[in-house]
Amino acid sequence: MSASEAQVIARALFDSLTGTALQALRAAASVNGELTPERVLAALPEDAPREIRNLVMALGREGNLDRLPAVVTAFEQMTRRGGARPLTGEVISAVELNPQQRERITAQLTARYGPDLELRFSVDESLIGGLIIRIGDQVLDTSLRTRMAAIQRNMMTS
C-alpha cells in the first residue's frame, strides 16, 4: 500500500467517522506481537465504529495489516488539520489535450481517487506520445519515450 493509498483510505475514514474512530484506530495499531485481524479486532473498544472493523478485516485480507500504523498517522494528521487536504495529481501529455480528453481523464481519476483530487495538466513534447500520470507517490507512465527506452534496453541485453 502506497502513501497515497493510505491517504485515500484515511480521507474516507475522516469523512465518515468521529473521535471514537481515532481512538479505536490507535488501539488497533497498538497491538503487540503478530498482527492478525482477530488480535486487532479484540483490541478495539466495544463501541468501535463498523467502518474501523471493516478496515481492519480488509487490511488483513489483503495482507496489509502492517500498514495500519501508516493509516492511523494519516488519519491523525487530517484530524489535526481539521480535515482532509486535497490529493494532488499531474497529467503530463506529449501534446495539449482537448477539453473532452481532460474531462474524461479527470472523471476516471476522480472515480478512483475521490472527488477531492486536484489535477494539473501540462505538456512535455519529449514524451513523443502517451501520458504520464502522477497521483501522490504513484506514477503511471504510458509515454512512447519510456516504451522506446524499454525496447532499447531489451535489445541491448539480448
UniProtKB/Swiss-Prot annotation:
GO terms for cellular component: plasma membrane; proton-transporting ATP synthase complex. GO terms for molecular function: proton-transporting ATP synthase activity, rotational mechanism. It comes from the Bacteria. The keyword Transmembrane does not apply. InterPro entries: ATPase_OSCP/d_CS, ATPase_OSCP/dsu. Belongs to the ATPase delta chain family. F(1)F(0) ATP synthase produces ATP from ADP in the presence of a proton or sodium gradient. F-type ATPases consist of two structural domains, F(1) containing the extramembraneous catalytic core and F(0) containing the membrane proton channel, linked together by a central stalk and a peripheral stalk. During catalysis, ATP synthesis in the catalytic domain of F(1) is coupled via a rotary mechanism of the central stalk subunits to proton translocation. This is ATP synthase subunit delta. It comes from Roseiflexus sp. (strain RS-1).
